[in-house]
Amino acid sequence: MLFRSVPNRALEAVMERYLHQFGLPDYSDEERAFAAELRATLTDDDLRNARLNAARTGGEAGYAWAEQLGDKLFMDEVAPYAVTRELLYGSTDVGDVSWVTPTAQCFAPCFTFGTPLHTWQLVAQGRTSIGHKGMFLAGKVMAATVLTLLTDSQALAGCREEFERVRAAQPYICPIPAGITPTKLAE
């Protein structure tokens, strides 16, 4: 049995606070020129799908926000946060982790808006200053979130209480049978 990711809304709220506090990266003229070159290789469907995915996770405000994106190369404001059942599905082991400990994820702008995942356009941006700025923002948000949990016992308790409530309603069953251990690849 495979498990979906279980969002922890209390933990998401802490992360969202830091996304707003730190703000989104500024981009140079050179970065914008590179982004425009990559954008020219994307299809209308790529952009439409990106807007739809961005909108779905922000509730009604998300749809209005996504429409305002227009042809912007980069998001210039943090997407609206909404408690929603809409999830962006992907191939990840975070789903299982989220059943073992409170887990939250954030999206940081590491690439030109509209870039599909698993494409050469995404890879081309990962080693650029565009990608590094987004990764640096994500790192700051994660670090500040952890610091909050280490220093604010009420925030930590809220995350834990929500996690225990969800787990009580639907217990986690590990898909790996008990007693299975990793084997050595080589001697």
What residue ranges belong to the model's regions?
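Metal-dependent amide/peptide-bond hydrolase catalytic core
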Residues: M1-E187
